[in-house]
Structure formats: C-alpha cells, structure tokens
C-alpha cells in the first residue's frame, strides 16, 4: 500500500498508522514483539508523511464499523517513509469547515480530502465514459483554441489569426 499517514498512535510501543489513499483508510500495525526495528522506525512517522507498506492482512480485534476497511488491519512486514511532510494547516478530512481562501491557498491539501477525491473520481469516470462512447461511435476529438475554455488561473488566451476573416482571431 502507498498513501498518507492520516493518524499515528503509539500505544506503549504498539504503533498504529491510519493510511489514507484514494480508496479510504487502512489501519497498519507495527508490533515490537514481531519486529522491534520496524516498530522503532514506525515511531518516526508523522501526520501526512507519505509512506509505503507491505504486510499480512488480519481480522481486527476491535472492528471499526465507521470505515469500509474497519474489519481488517495490516500487520507490517516492512514499510518506509517516501516523503516527510510539514504539519498541515488543517486536518485532511471532511469534518473540518474551511473558508474558500484557505482551500484555494492550500489546494494541494484540499484535493486530498475524501469529498474532493470523490468529486475528482466521479468527474474522471464521467470523462472516461464520454470519451469511450464517442470513440466507439467514430467521433473525432478536436481541440482548438476556439473550442477550449479560458483558464481561471489568469493565463493569457492563445490567439489564432483567421485566414478567412482578416483582423479576426480565434
């Protein structure tokens, strides 16, 4: 698995990491009795660090029915920190209300929130279905400046002079 460390808990040496990826939350467990070196490394994981993990799936002793993967956990065989992260300015969850300025300033974090992930995945699925339909029905996709929308980021439009209508642009 690869993802962000959403929550890290140290319960007397037993380390729990809630790994968040595009599919949701999966609990990882580092047990010092099984692998003390691995448990020691897991202590250094902080919120929003990017991590990879491999291990054995087992049934949880205390299921968490609030999440789809709440019946299982991954007992770590190995893991690593791909990238350390600074403490984010807000918690990456849907429960936190953010004003628009904060959301736009930290757009890269806002897009990690489950609600935003769901919107992106739904939009992606819509585009895939639409493209597939048009391709299967022999439509030709064209992208011209005339048909493309302007970007909201403030980039200038690319003007294309018309050969047919002198002094006019697309």
Positions of predicted regions on the chain:
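Class II aminoacyl-tRNA synthetase-like tRNA-binding/catalytic domains
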Residues: 2-170
